[in-house]
Design a protein with these regions (language model features):
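Active-site loop/lid in soluble adenylation, ligation, and acyl-transfer enzymes
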Residues: 2-155, 264-270, 274-301
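Hydrophobic, aromatic-enriched alpha-helical segments typical of multi-pass transmembrane helices
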Residues: 1-2, 201
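Catalytic activation segment of kinase domains across protein kinase-like and atypical kinase folds
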Residues: 206, 210-251
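A short mid-domain helix/strand-loop element embedded in enzyme catalytic domains
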Residues: 145-177
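Short, active-site-adjacent segments that bind or coordinate small-molecule cofactors and metal centers
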Residues: 103-105, 200-208, 213-215, 280
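C-lobe/activation-segment region of protein kinase-like
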Residues: 241, 245-273, 278
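A long amphipathic alpha-helix within ATP-dependent nucleotide-binding catalytic cores
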Residues: 175-206
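Catalytic cores of nucleic-acid ligases and guanylyltransferases
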Residues: 38, 94-95, 193, 220-228
Length: 301
């Protein structure tokens, strides 16, 4: 039986390491950037001690799928390790299916969030104020209700800890009105297209978080796109208003951490094998459903 290796730390001889996020490690490749998606998993903004098999490959290949599906400028050059420079190809066994060569961008210091359903922090905000990020919504909506139309709710980009929701006017103060309006339009367009496609696969795209930056002065989609880490997907068959529907992400991990009364501060605990296995299967299921089946390597080709 094949056992998928788990990658939680990545350092590559001959490639300068630039930075690491909760999941991704970045390396310099000339003027470009190599983004390696590891199998690390964070919950409640804390990285767990062990990784999730297949997670990094699923996130990387799904982002590639969406970059190619969406008709918007993006930073992707290639996900095919065999097309990358020799310094990268030297690490092909580690990098295949989990590495992306991209153009360097100057990121905007905001997260661009689109919400089509009332869930998560949006639901909490609505219960207190009747609005989400300053956007007033109809009275009497229930948890997980579909919104009359998708809304744009930007957030600050936190290096550590939680992103914080901000109003559109606050975003304007950070990036300028013209840029803010363009980012809002792009975000809502991408969400609408992604949600329509997901619907054909029996999924509801409840919300998503996108990042943009400037490449040669042009607004460009960067980072990850419409993955289970950046988006909330629900099986349409299980959707009900008034409850939080099951999602294709790390819910098993969050439920486990709540059951052990995790303090939500580092270090993260070691996840038990059953939680790891069920979480891995959720990520792989999302990949199979969204891409029409097949294996990671089939999509790579």
């Amino acid at each position: 039986m094949h056992t998928e290796p788990v990658l939680t730390q990545c350092r590559l001889a001959g490639l300068p390491h630039l930075a690491s996020g909760k999941v991704r490690d970045m390396f310099a490749v000339g003027d470009d950037l190599l983004v390696v998606t590891t199998d690390r998993l964070s919950a409640f903004d804390v990285v767990m001690a062990n990784g999730i098999p297949w997670k990094g490959k699923v996130l990387n290949r799904l982002s590639e799928f969406w970059f190619r599906f969406l008709d918007v400028p993006n930073h992707l050059l290639t996900c095919d390790v065999d097309e990358m420079p020799a310094t990268v190809r030297a690490h092909a066994d580690i990098l295949r299916d989990r590495a992306m060569l991209v153009r360097r961008a100057e990121p905007f210091p905001v997260e661009c969030v689109a919400r089509g359903y009332l869930i998560g922090s949006g639901w909490s905000d609505y219960q207190k104020t009747g609005a989400v990020c300053g956007i007033t919504l109809p009275a009497g909506l229930r948890q997980a209700a579909r919104l009359p139309e998708p809304i744009f709710t930007p957030a600050t980009k936190a290096v550590t800890g939680h992103d914080e929701n901000i109003g559109f006017d606050e975003m304007v103060a950070v990036v300028g009105r013209e840029t803010a309006e363009r980012l809002r339009a792009l975000t809502l367009s991408i969400y609408t297209r992604g949600a329509a496609y997901a619907e054909t696969k029996g999924l509801i795209l409840a919300d998503t978080k996108l990042e943009f930056g400037l490449v040669d002065g042009c607004i460009t989609l960067i980072d990850e796109v419409l993955t289970p880490d950046s988006s909330r997907y629900w099986p349409a068959a299980d959707y009900r208003e008034g409850i939080s529907p099951p999602s294709f992400d790390k819910q098993f991990v969050r439920d486990y951490l709540e059951s052990i009364h995790f303090a939500k501060t580092p270090p993260g605990p070691t996840l038990p094998p059953d939680v790891v296995a069920r979480t891995s299967e959720k990520y792989r299921e999302a990949f199979r459903v969204l891409t029409g089946g097949g294996t990671i390597h089939a999509l790579a080709r």
